[in-house]
């Protein structure tokens, strides 16, 4: 593919949704029709191009975000296919951070499902413009209009319907394009490559007119001139409608809704047209937030080829042929192989070696990349997810990503001494790839503990350790990742002194600890953090160079809380005063003082134990509803809602994760295998005192 330098010709998009809504199948069809793939891969056969890890092909689900580049009309589309399973939410999170637009795929039968809501909220957080593709219109029970209502009710979104389905279930044969007011019908035998326009079927004329009027009512509001034209009865042209749909989509006034059946090869080409027509180019996004290293000043940086180089690393991946690959999104400037850049987060220089354009796990070497591109760099030494790579002379740090706290953990130990060293290497490599996966050592037992977002997440980590690194390990039972916090403000004044012979140590710190939810003037960028540190030192009571030691000490010690040695979260520490000695003070002395101040001060803050609460959604036939609700209540669950969906009932409840182990078997026996459930992490909440006593006793 020849390089197009014009930023307006690039679309960086993600395809995301609930598990099984058909994201990967939709992406496969896109690759086929854009000429990237000469054979369509089917997910259920384990042949999908984008699902390239062995585990993905066996399980038929997408675990990591595969990135690929393709071409439609005169535009370059960089696509990231993201997982829909809740345990891999981090993959969605980091993809959305670097994308300019997204296609949210919905199952035409199930509509808006729990993970769809999670992904939608994540996209809201990063202000990603998006459009909706209601898939599986050929399936029994598919209902396009109900899906549109669910977009309003469950997501609070403003859908802009631009297509209607022609036929339903097995009779689904095409769409009505409400912009052109034409029907688009596919020929079955031609793998969807052949389709033709015809007049709207007579029995759908009224519905098409109704939805066309709704479409026009919404778009003309964005342009006074077009509105006047519309109100005076003049025809609004297709070009004007497209321009206003683009304007409204980019500013998130509404979300265009399309439909089709990716599996049956219907509706994919108009979806590609809509990606090009309505989703933003990097120029439409315009700026990226960050700060200048030299001044520390927060500012907006222009997305432009002519600005100094700045890129964000959003994924690390181990490739069996190339080694470690770092995926970057270039926001400004350009880079060539052989250039040296700086990782401004770690203050380490990195030399750019091989630069690759990725097509799932196939690769194409490129010598140059510029603003708007998503490329993979081979052989970077110190760069991890969320780091900024920058021009050495004009250094910037781009806004970082927030990573969720793990909710489940288990102990692993190597089966033999030969596996010991290999296991350490394997786990550190896997942790570098995935920021929601953590590795630590239990300081009491010396065991290695791995932590993640769910049982499937850790199961796949262990599986990869065995397959890719040939490490055999014994696995403990899953444990809940409890946390600790404080519930009231407390203050501690602590002096660390060691001045008896030899080099001395001296540091005094006065720190105020307070619960984050009680901090009145919390900055916006701190609202999603679990620990915030601030220095209010005036007049040099503690020299500037020692203050990072205080923050480092607190950050390290908070990993072992004061109730039952669980990590301490959701608090702010403010350094308000202190003292130093000209000879005996050092960064290390202040680090030690901060740790001791934490140990002494935190018990005064009325510390409490926290547990992860999951949002559980159960879909069940009517007759099992009573038993299922009773069982959820017995698990300390709080029922949030009960809604009919088709001929089933949907129960939503908040339930502690500790009570959900083995739930799949209970649900199976309560409903004779007819109910299904999904759960996603909701929040941390205080553990009831009688339960907390049991947890403390076990520690």
Curated annotation (Swiss-Prot):
Gene designation: fusA
Keywords for this protein: Cytoplasm, Elongation factor, GTP-binding, Nucleotide-binding, Protein biosynthesis
Coiled coil: none
Family matches, as PANTHER family: RIBOSOME-RELEASING FACTOR 2, MITOCHONDRIAL, TRANSLATION ELONGATION FACTOR G-RELATED
Binding site for GTP: 17-24, 81-85, 135-138
NCBIfam families referenced in this protein's UniProt entry, alphabetically: EF-G (TIGR00484), PRK12740.1-5 (NF009381), small_GTP (TIGR00231)
InterPro entries (alphabetical): EF-G-like_DII (IPR053905), EFG_II (IPR041095), EFG_III (IPR009022), EFG_III/V (IPR035647), EFG_IV (IPR047872), EFG_V (IPR035649), EFG_V-like (IPR000640), G_TR_CS (IPR031157)
SUPFAM superfamilies listed in its UniProt record: EF-G C-terminal domain-like, P-loop containing nucleoside triphosphate hydrolases, Ribosomal protein S5 domain 2-like, Translation proteins
Protein name: Elongation factor G
Similarity remark: Belongs to the TRAFAC class translation factor GTPase superfamily. Classic translation factor GTPase family. EF-G/EF-2 subfamily.
Domain tr-type G: residue ranges: 8-283
GO molecular function: GTP binding; GTPase activity; translation elongation factor activity
One GO BP annotation of this record: ribosome disassembly
SMART domains, per database record: EFG_C, EFG_IV
Gene Ontology CC terms: cytoplasm
Localization per Swiss-Prot or TrEMBL: Cytoplasm
